[in-house]
Curated annotation (Swiss-Prot):
Domain BTB intervals: 29-98
Family matches, as Pfam families: BACK (PF07707), BTB (PF00651)
CDD domains in the cross-refs: BACK_BTBD19, BTB_POZ_BTBD19
Family annotation (PROSITE patterns): BTB (PS50097)
Residue ranges of every copy of the BACK domain listed in the record: 134-234
Protein name: BTB/POZ domain-containing protein 19
Length: 291
């Protein structure tokens, strides 16, 4: 009886190095990509991409016609991120950079590269800081990356004031902002949070060319106006007349809490203090303290 064969393994490093030398190398390349807004030309090898990634297998399944084939245009992925994806497909490793890792993560999700996605997520979690966290939160919400969203929200809860001052906060979508405004653990006072929400809505209104109140509508119900002192609420009401942001009925509800000297236990959240809520004299009348 013939003895079963034995699988032996050579050194992996030289193999990986050799394949890395083919990344974006026109030598023996049979497919060209034009990627990103910069329209950078990138060379690759059809069989390798197809066997490593179902997305590229489908994309490249048609046989190229005679003559010089037209390039495959991928305009939404930046060139640097696409090259990192290619490096991973060729070598099963990639060099990630803080400034571009979210773009690589986005590409990994869109191309169905689960292993690269997990590597990017691990990198992002370790690299989280005030400047990166809102961009990471936006990616997490957009692609339903629940664990990353939880880590981002927890980071922002611990560094609320610094995060609210970043450009990334102003560029959040409404669905990404909602979990922050719903949090009891934000280390920021409600008056400052109202100002941040107004700044966010102004930026969105300018970009989308829509009224501030319309942009703010999906999120402002999460502002806890009953936590503001009467003088603060009066000032907010006056500003709201000049620049509508908050529905009038929401301000009326806050005044009702002051008039009745109690919170609305049925609705709960509008009267519940956050971790960073500064004490005010009327808070002793509210039913729901910070938990």
């Amino acid at each position: 009886m013939e003895t079963p064969g034995l699988v032996v393994h050579g050194e992996a490093a030289p193999f990986s190095t050799a394949l890395r030398s083919l990344v974006n190398n026109p030598l023996y390349s049979d497919v060209r990509f034009v990627v990103g807004q910069e329209r950078q030309e990138v060379f690759a090898h059809r069989c390798l991409l197809a066997c490593r990634c179902n997305f590229f297998q489908r994309l490249l399944s048609s046989e190229p016609g005679p003559g010089v084939p037209s390039p495959v245009v991928l305009s939404t992925v930046p060139a640097e991120a696409f090259l990192a994806v290619l490096e991973f497909l060729y070598t099963n490793s990639a060099k990630l950079q803080r400034h571009s890792v979210l773009e690589v993560l986005t590409a990994a999700v869109e191309y169905g590269l689960e292993e690269l996605r997990e590597l990017c997520l691990e990198f992002v979690v370790k690299a989280l800081d005030v400047e990166l966290v809102c961009e990471a939160l936006q990616v997490a919400v957009t692609f339903g990356l629940g664990q990353l969203q939880e880590r981002c929200v927890a980071f922002i809860e611990a560094h609320s004031q610094e995060t609210l001052r970043t450009r990334g906060f102003l560029e959040l979508s409404a669905p990404a902002l909602l979990p922050l405004l719903r949090s009891d653990k934000l280390c920021v006072d409600e008056a400052e949070l109202v100002l941040a929400a107004r700044s966010w809505a102004r930026v969105g209104a300018a970009v989308l060319e829509r009224p501030v109140a319309e942009v703010a509508a999906p999120v402002v119900r999460e502002l806890r106006l009953a936590l503001l002192a009467p003088a603060e609420l009066s000032a907010l009401e006056e500003q709201n007349r000049r620049e509508p942001l908050i529905p009038v009925e929401q301000i009326v509800e806050a005044w009702k809490c002051h008039a009745l000297r109690r919170g609305d236990a049925a609705r709960g959240t509008p009267c519940r203090r956050r971790r960073g809520t500064l004490p005010r004299e009327h808070h002793r009348f509210l039913d729901l303290p910070f938990k």
